[in-house]
Amino acid sequence: MTKNKLDLIFKSYDIRGVYGDSIDQDIAYKIGKAFAEFVPDDTIIVGHDGRVSNIEMLDAFTSGIKSINKEIIYVGLVPTDTVYSLSGLLKKPGAIITASHNPKNYNGLKLCNAGAIPIGENSGLMDIKKLADRNVEIRIEKFQNNDKYLGNEYYEHLKNLVSPESISQKLNFGIDGGNGVYLVRYLIL
C-alpha cells in the first residue's frame, strides 16, 4: 500500500498529496529518514509553511531525520525561498514542508541538496522514493527545537541588507503575499 501512495505523491520536482489520505505521518517519517540517508551532510535545514497539518508533518519528518542521528537547523514558519536561501548561504541541504499552491487539505515537501540545488525526478528524488519504500520501525516524537533555530538570525540578515540611511528617495515597493506566510512580513517589518 505504501508503494502505491509513494507513486501518487512523488512528482517531478516535489512530493505532495492529500494529507491523511495519500500522505500521512508514517510516510513523512519514511521520507525524512530517506532524505537524511540520501544527503551526505550531518545537518539539514527544515522549515514549513502555515498549513494546519504541518505540525504533524514536522514531528514525523524530523523524527525520520533524527532516526539516523542527523542534526536539524529549524527555521520555523517561513516561505519556501527562506529554506533555499539558507541552503545556499550555509551550504546545507534543506526541506520545506509545503504543498505550494495546492488546496489546504494537501501537504508535501520540497527538497534541496546543499547549495540550494533542487532535488527533482532526475536528480535524486526517485532515489529518495526508493529509500522511503522500505519497511522501517517508525518512532514519531514531538519535535522539540533542541537543535539550531535560525529564523530570527535570517530575518535580521534580511533587515540588514539595506540600511534606511542608504535610501535617499521615496521608495515604492510591493509585497508578494502568494507564498502564504504572513507572519514573516510582520517579523521583517
Describe each model-derived feature in a short phrase:
Residues F35, L90, A132-N135:
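Alpha-helix boundary/capping residues
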Residues N107-L189:
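Gly/Ser/Thr-enriched, mixed-charge loops and adjacent short helices
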Residues V18-D24, A36, R51, T80, ...:
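Short, electropositive, low-hydrophobicity segments enriched in small/polar residues
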Residues P40-A114:
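Ferredoxin-reductase
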Residues L6-R16, G20, V75, P103-L109, ...:
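Generic secondary-structure boundary/loop-capping signal
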Residues D26-Y29, D59, G88, G120, ...:
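Generic secondary-structure boundary signal with a strong preference for alpha-helix termini
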Residues M1-S63, S67-N69, Q144-L171, G177:
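An N-terminal, well-structured beta->alpha segment
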Residues F38, I72-V75, H101-P103, E121-D127, ...:
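Short, surface-exposed, polar/charged, turn-prone segments marking secondary-structure boundaries
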